[in-house]
């Protein structure tokens, strides 16, 4: 079983991002961690600490609408086990309106999982045999608010996802 963690939208809250990531990554072995934008400088500030603490962890970042000053891509594709992933912030795909443009991107990439942020609203939706996962904002709103998303990929490439709350990781 492979494990992917997605977080998003730190908006300058570097310590909160660090606390969330270390708590969530410390729960179980993780293969990939993805930051979905709007705080890429925060990501850069903690990147080496995370890489040192979790050797072998693959770390990815995409830029959001508030990250124009960084050189990260708007959208990335990667594979975890037998599952194809795409990841973006979502502002260029109009995710605050609907997921239509992101669906087209996911179908084109033959993705089983599409990760996005931007809305600050945690959600997991299944369209066209693809999981569309928004982890919400790491800022959270109360102890039961989602701060991350966990995506599991089994040996056959089947995927499942859930949200992890601040309360669950003691934050």
Which sequence ranges carry the predicted segments?
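Active-site neighborhood of phospho(di)ester-bond hydrolases with catalytic His/Asp-centered motifs
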Residues: 6-8, 32-38, 60-65, 86-89, ...
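Binuclear metal-dependent phosphoesterase catalytic core
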Residues: 108-111, 126, 133-171
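Non-DNA-binding regulatory cores of transcription-related proteins
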Residues: 99-109
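Short acidic, glycine/proline-enriched helix-loop-strand junctions
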Residues: 50-59, 125-139
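Active-site environment of divalent metal-dependent phosphoester hydrolases
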Residues: 11-15, 40-44, 66-72, 93-98, ...
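Beta-strand-turn-beta hairpins that frame and shape the catalytic cleft
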Residues: 1-5, 77-86, 126-132, 153-163
